Amino acid sequence: MKKSTLINSGISYLVATLGHTDEITICDAGLPIPDHVQRIDLALTHGVPSFLDTVRVILSESQIEGVIIAEEFSDVSPVLHEALLKELSKESEETGKSIEIKYVSHEAFKARTEQSRAVVRTGECTPYANVIFQAGVVF
């Protein structure tokens, strides 16, 4: 059995095969997922697993250099938005690498998911709890 934090085989494979600048979307239970993009559906029930728990686990296994977030997230769900920024800041401090944060409209965010290698759907039911991770390099 795998010893590290991430034991989901689909996400583990995805992270292992990411190239520089590839994108992964982590989303709430309601975000539409394009038909042609791989769907990794973790949602069990409302709030399980949570958006933040999923973000933390994926960050523990992958190097990112940027994120894309919907502008509406900070206005509509400020507590969870701040918690996400805190996790990104912590990751940046631990790795010594900066993480660029880009804000776009929710409509532009949904369109951008078309470029994702995969969309990881959580059970989160907080509005706009979505983020796109852009893969970085570990060297």
From Swiss-Prot:
This protein's GO CC annotations: cytosol
Coiled coil: none
SUPFAM superfamilies (UniProt xref): RbsD-like
Pathway(s) where this gene product acts: Carbohydrate metabolism; D-ribose degradation; D-ribose 5-phosphate from beta-D-ribopyranose: step 1/2
Domain of life: Bacteria
Parts of the chain that traverse the membrane: none
GO MF annotation terms: D-ribose pyranase activity; intramolecular lyase activity; monosaccharide binding
EC numbers: 5.4.99.62
GO biological process: D-ribose catabolic process
Record's subcellular location: Cytoplasm
Annotated active site: 20 (proton donor)
Reaction catalyzed: beta-D-ribopyranose = beta-D-ribofuranose
Entries under InterPro entries matching the protein: D-ribose_pyranase, RbsD-like_sf, RbsD_FucU
Positions with a binding annotation for substrate: 28, 106, 128-130
Functional description taken from the UniProt entry: Catalyzes the interconversion of beta-pyran and beta-furan forms of D-ribose.
Record text on subunit structure and interactions: Homodecamer.
Annotated family: Belongs to the RbsD / FucU family. RbsD subfamily.
Protein name: D-ribose pyranase
Organism: Vibrio parahaemolyticus serotype O3:K6 (strain RIMD 2210633)
Gene: rbsD
